[in-house]
């Protein structure tokens, strides 16, 4: 299977969506300071901005399209100004189409300045959190929402804590294998439609389609609700993609990996991921093999142990030992008559 689909990316979100979801997902507790139409304001940038220079009058490089954070420094600067100068300083912000303003550490905003923001249609929020914590939480939220993503056909299972993604042609039994893994105590992340987000440069986070959730379709049986049938222990919402297992139809002309010395990889959204290709033929217990794939991954990651390399080293050592024994026997034979 080729993961060559171009990654997608959310282009923007409304401030209303931002406010509702960040309060649900994070312990940030934003409160509204004014009533404006938050649907008309859109956030298009995952970075935040502290407009200290803009308040001081330097707006040449003002990144006004970002969420603006007013912390202790900005608020104390405004508060030390007289009323007229304070309004002129705040005008340097509200004259631009700013998505929203967030005031941290429960600082009080001058009612006159709040009226200016309301008149300009700019939502203003306040939080008790410090600027550092607010920036950390909001940045993490925006990075997640604006990350590159794509949806793939397959199943995603947490096997011994290793994120294993099962892919392959339709009808090969990916869902059945995933169901068998769940029955053996592992956890289903997604089936049929796996949504993968790239977080940072090298981390792939898999989750399920929000409509399908943890339902599975098993040919001949129908729809299975994994959460209802196996309990909460059988599911999880997200998991890092660490290994891709491709189920393939058996082809006697194809050269399959037998030792495991050559590690194959595949690229998902530009990130290299180990790839294991498993041919399907009668008599193979695919579920157990996938468990061993996960265990081998853990051995390699945490102890650097690779079974194929260990066996290769033992064979080399055995050959060297036999060569030494042969040389020693030949030397003794010439000096002593064993017959």
UniProtKB/Swiss-Prot annotation:
Notes concerning its domains: The Walker A ATP-binding motif also binds Pi and PPi.
Native source organism of the sequence: Chlorobium phaeobacteroides (strain BS1)
Assembly and oligomerization: Homohexamer.
UniProt binding sites for Mg(2+): 175, 217
GO biological process: regulation of carbohydrate metabolic process
Name of this protein: HPr kinase/phosphorylase
Reaction equations catalysed: [HPr protein]-L-serine + ATP = [HPr protein]-O-phospho-L-serine + ADP + H(+); [HPr protein]-O-phospho-L-serine + phosphate + H(+) = [HPr protein]-L-serine + diphosphate
Alphabetized InterPro entries for the sequence: HPr(Ser)_kin/Pase, Hpr_kin/Pase_C, Hpr_kin/Pase_Hpr_N, P-loop_NTPase, Ser_kin/Pase_Hpr-like_N_sf
Stretch list, region Important for the catalytic mechanism of dephosphorylation: 279-284
Family annotation (HAMAP family): HPr_kinase (MF_01249)
Keywords for this protein: ATP-binding, Kinase, Magnesium, Metal-binding, Multifunctional enzyme, Nucleotide-binding, Serine/threonine-protein kinase, Transferase
Entry's EC annotation: 2.7.11.-, 2.7.4.-
Other information: Both phosphorylation and phosphorolysis are carried out by the same active site and suggest a common mechanism for both reactions.
